């Protein structure tokens, strides 16, 4: 009995069926590791916004202030007044970079009469 596929066909099937999916899985895992919160908006909505959204009125409004990334990282890591510190195990540095970029892209909230 002969095997119906040539050596080249077997290699192509192996690459397509085994190697390629494994590579995609590894790449997806790396992308997940790059930022544990996925995006700056997601982090802001799920963590920061509970105190810092304009309509909440607990912490200072961050939107449209143009706060430097280094300032945001320092406050988040060390805390300040009523704001607790958040360790890197909870909010990674890449996520802080993304939230700083997100906040700088937002306009300042409209002044209240």
From Swiss-Prot:
Keyword entries, A-Z: Electron transport, Heme, Iron, Metal-binding, Plasmid, Signal, Transport
Signal peptide (from-to): 1-33
Pathway it works in: Aromatic compound metabolism; p-cresol degradation
InterPro entries, sorted: Cyt_c-like_dom (IPR009056), Cyt_c-like_dom_sf (IPR036909)
Modifications made to the protein after synthesis: Binds 1 heme c group covalently per subunit.
Gene Ontology MF term list: electron transfer activity; heme binding; metal ion binding
Residues involved in heme c binding: 48, 51-52, 83
Assembly behavior: Tetramer of two cytochrome subunits and two flavoprotein subunits.
Role according to the record: This is the heme-containing component of the p-cresol methylhydroxylase. It accepts electrons from the flavoprotein subunit.
Protein name: 4-cresol dehydrogenase [hydroxylating] cytochrome c subunit
Organism: Pseudomonas putida (Arthrobacter siderocapsulatus)
